[in-house]
């Protein structure tokens, strides 16, 4: 007999999604799903965008369930008024079995084109490729790839433009990157994208051992294992430098790691920073200003920014 879980659904303004999702992940110990929202690795183009988003979390039916429900209600009451358009509603509660919980979220993920050549395709979806398409097959797992912001998309767009010498990157570097460092690899999608675009040696690190396992499965699925090396090695312990460094993490972490990230960029190399709220652009730029990197481009989508920097040849 399948185990029964409780699904708790909260409808909140879009700007509150990240805060609520982080709280629910910590409270439940499981991933969350977000409806009516553009996801970071797949498209919801069949769902009309809405200023209100539904965040769902999943809890085991046990003695702690009532306390968890109270905690969610208290969190909404305490934090919701800080966000425009918030109206308190009691979370909707539904019972679902384990099989439904494990698979229900997949219906929101569809293939999506990013840039001119990259296409991210969930493993369970069919897709008819066009000539020149580079297909990234991904199974992010319940806790990966279901975030609510376009930081990964912008990173991939910048990645493609660097490798193809397009847009702001045209004529900046004479050759495409050969070596890549992916800091906070998560599902591994950025490393896979770099491999598909032609990188020859990619080092992908994450402090979360579970993320490294999932990334390894996705790398193998895309037949990139001979190019991508995954580990939980701390950034500070890595040696050498790279033609391209990618870091899709929070602004505060980017600034904290600024010196370590900057020193990993080879001359004539790029540093792409994402996971940045637009209001923190200057905070991040100031954090990296001592290290001699030139601003090439800032991409913006919604409330998020992606910054690309370049280290002039010595």
From Swiss-Prot:
It is found in: Cytoplasm. S-adenosyl-L-methionine binds at residues 152, 184, 206, 248. Its main location: cytoplasm. The gene is prmA. This is Ribosomal protein L11 methyltransferase. Pfam families: PrmA. Its EC number is 2.1.1.-. It is an enzyme of class 2 (transferase). One of its GO terms (biological process) is methylation. Signal peptide: none annotated. Keywords: Cytoplasm, Methyltransferase, S-adenosyl-L-methionine, Transferase. SUPFAM superfamilies: S-adenosyl-L-methionine-dependent methyltransferases. Methylates ribosomal protein L11. Belongs to the methyltransferase superfamily. PrmA family. One of its GO terms (cellular component) is cytoplasm. GO terms for molecular function: protein-lysine N-methyltransferase activity. It comes from the Bacteria. The keyword Signal does not apply.
């Amino acid at each position: 007999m399948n185990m029964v879980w409780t699904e708790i659904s909260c409808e909140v303004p879009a700007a509150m999604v990240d805060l609520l999702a982080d709280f629910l992940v910590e409270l439940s110990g499981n991933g969350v799903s977000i409806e009516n929202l553009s996801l970071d690795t797949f498209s919801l183009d069949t769902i009309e965008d809405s200023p209100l988003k539904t965040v769902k979390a999943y809890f085991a039916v046990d003695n702690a369930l009532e306390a968890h429900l109270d905690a969610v209600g208290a969190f909404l009451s305490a934090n919701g008024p800080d966000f425009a358009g918030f109206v308190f509603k009691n979370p909707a509660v539904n019972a679902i079995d384990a099989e439904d919980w494990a698979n229900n979220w997949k219906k929101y993920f569809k293939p999506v084109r990013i840039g001119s050549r990259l296409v991210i395709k969930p493993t369970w979806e069919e897709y008819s490729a066009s000539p020149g398409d580079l297909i990234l097959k991904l199974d992010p797992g319940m806790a990966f790839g279901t975030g609510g912001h376009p930081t990964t998309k912008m990173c991939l767009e910048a990645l493609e433009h660097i490798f193809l010498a397009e847009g702001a990157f045209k004529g900046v570097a004479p050759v495409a990157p050969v070596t890549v460092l992916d800091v906070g690899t998560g599902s591994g999608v950025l490393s896979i994208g770099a491999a598909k675009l032609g990188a020859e040696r990619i080092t992908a690190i994450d402090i979360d051992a579970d993320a490294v396992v999932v990334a390894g499965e996705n790398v193998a699925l895309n037949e990139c294992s001979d190019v991508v090396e995954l580990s939980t090695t701390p950034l500070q312990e890595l040696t050498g430098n790279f033609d391209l460094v990618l870091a899709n993490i929070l602004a505060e972490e980017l600034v904290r790691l600024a010196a370590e990230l900057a020193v990993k960029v080879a001359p004539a190399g790029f540093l792409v920073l994402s996971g940045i709220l637009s209001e923190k652009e200057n905070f991040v730029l100031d954090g990296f200003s001592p290290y001699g990197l030139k601003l090439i481009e800032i991409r913006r989508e919604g409330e998020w920014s992606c910054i690309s920097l370049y280290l002039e040849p010595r």
